[in-house]
């Protein structure tokens, strides 16, 4: 607990690997370092309301062991072609839950991102130009609101809306010989788009909860292309039937059609 009333709790951890020390002793030509962390914060705002914040991520670094004394041919080969790299990733999310007699309301916001960088210098000398320079970033942001009703005329209903955005960026630079001349190849790629969704499921049990029916419908749209703007063109229906004909046996059947983003 991090509050006096005990309604707010925090759980967190961090780890770091020291493989670079072991690899250095073994005389390996690369020295990795790995780090990861995670946390969860939960706060009860009242008898019916709760807020939570969660996250996990990592950041890693792999550098070359250029301090090797008298490296053999295998070590020289690896040092000659292997680039150094840094990469990191994380997922953060926050949510609010309001519970009431007939069900609950949940709102969730999240973001995840990944970054990767590769680079190498001539003869592993950082004062010389880079022979490889690669950078990529991608991220995804989402928001979702969902309501669950446990009894609507004997039915159970879940429905909601959501949306978000995605981004991808890649930049690459490297020297290349073309027609006997040295030039720098450049590659740049960027992509950004939005997304939105609607979804609902309706279910009910019959015959003393031995037979159940679930009907679901989902609609997805995105700004990636004009053909995908209208969510009514990307409808994903689903039907599931389940029958418990013996205490240890249940027969289930489902049919669905899904559109993948």
Locations of regions flagged by a protein language model:
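Flexible loop and strand-edge segments within Gram-negative outer membrane beta-barrel domains
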Residues: 19, 24-31, 50-99, 113-138
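Structural signature of Gram-negative outer-membrane beta-barrels, strongest in the C-terminal barrel
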Residues: 56, 152-156, 162, 186-261
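Hydrophobic, lipid-facing positions within transmembrane beta-strands of outer-membrane proteins
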Residues: 1, 35-39, 55-57, 88-94, ...
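Predominantly transmembrane beta-strands of Gram-negative outer membrane beta-barrel pores used
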Residues: 1-29, 36-44, 52-56
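Surface-exposed extracellular loop regions of Gram-negative outer-membrane beta-barrel proteins
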Residues: 67-72, 115-117, 172-175, 243, ...
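Transmembrane beta-strands of outer-membrane beta-barrel pores
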Residues: 16-20, 57-61, 100-102, 111-115, ...
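Repeated loop/turn-to-beta-strand initiation elements of outer-membrane beta-barrel proteins
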Residues: 8-10, 48-51, 102-105, 115, ...
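Structural signature of outer-membrane beta-barrel channels/translocons
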Residues: 1-4, 42-46, 95-101, 148-156, ...
């Amino acid at each position: 607990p991090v509050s006096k009333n005990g309604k707010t709790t925090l759980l967190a951890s961090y780890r770091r690997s020291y493989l670079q020390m072991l690899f250095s002793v073994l005389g390996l030509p690369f020295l990795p370092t790995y780090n990861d962390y995670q946390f969860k914060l939960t706060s009860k705002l009242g008898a019916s309301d709760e807020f939570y914040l969660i996250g996990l991520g990592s950041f890693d670094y792999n550098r070359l062991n250029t301090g090797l004394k008298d490296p053999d041919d295998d070590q020289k080969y690896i040092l000659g072609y292997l680039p150094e790299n840094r990469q990191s990733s994380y997922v953060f999310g926050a949510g609010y839950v309001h519970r009431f007699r007939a069900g609950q309301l949940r709102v969730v916001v999240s973001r995840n991102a990944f970054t990767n960088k590769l680079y190498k210098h001539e003869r592993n000398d950082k004062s010389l130009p880079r022979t490889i320079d690669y950078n990529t970033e991608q991220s995804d942001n989402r928001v979702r609101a969902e309501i669950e009703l446990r009894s609507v005329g004997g039915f159970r209903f879940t429905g909601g809306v959501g949306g978000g955005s995605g981004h991808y960026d890649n930049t690459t630079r490297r020297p290349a010989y073309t027609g006997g001349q040295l030039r720098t190849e450049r590659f740049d790629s960027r992509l950004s788009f939005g997304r939105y969704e609607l979804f609902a499921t309706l279910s009910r049990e019959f015959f003393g909860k031995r037979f159940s029916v679930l009907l679901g419908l989902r609609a997805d749209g995105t700004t990636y292309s004009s053909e995908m703007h209208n969510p009514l063109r990307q409808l994903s229906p689903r039907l599931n039937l389940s029958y418990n004909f013996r205490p240890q046996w249940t027969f289930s059947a489902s049919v669905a059609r899904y559109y993948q983003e």
